[in-house]
């Protein structure tokens, strides 16, 4: 149970009676499927700002779920089970659709939508989302798809193919949690991207840590050399 400034209660599902991962996943699968059917998923919109761009009204979207009693469940609790059981493509498309609806109602300049490795391999994704945005009478530039650095590194070829397909339709592409592995330079060289989102761990205590300052400066310079914009994670 967690309470923020608006006193939103975050619920922890009791899985103590389910001892194995398979048994626990069975509980989560049932909850996720019922949430999809009963409209108990919703997005949280987190304002973000580029370190270089003058764009305003940009948001990072995160999905959350409510149980049948209305208790809120964080994505870190239910997404792992969805990933293990082939539900991520369905969830990703729900999130994308909800993000497009948000843009249509709010007129946000851009929303950042993270997609899973399952959706990276979804050859119909780019065409599907382009039609979705067209139906909403929005420019494709409102959506920036993002993939974590480690996922992109593990799925280099399909990630490059998807980034290229999305770019052909006018969508933006970003790598998040950037800079925490040795793959950063290689990703910048081999992947087509519009943004990097420097991992929050590098931003914490930045003002007093010269090693972090040097690394962040290097990442920003590498990105700038390739005309890639930089966003800092977890900076308030």
Task: List PLM regions with ranges.
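Cyclic nucleotide signaling catalytic output domains
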Residues: 1-4, 9-27, 31, 77, ...
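Active-site core of bacterial EAL-family cyclic-dinucleotide phosphodiesterase domains
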Residues: 14-81, 114, 146, 175, ...
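Conserved long alpha-helical elements within nucleotide-processing catalytic cores of c-di-GMP signaling
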Residues: 76-80, 89, 164
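Catalytic core of bacterial c-di-GMP phosphodiesterases, primarily the EAL and HD-GYP domains
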Residues: 55-60, 87-158, 234
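Signal-transducing alpha-helical linker
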Residues: 20, 24-27, 37, 83, ...
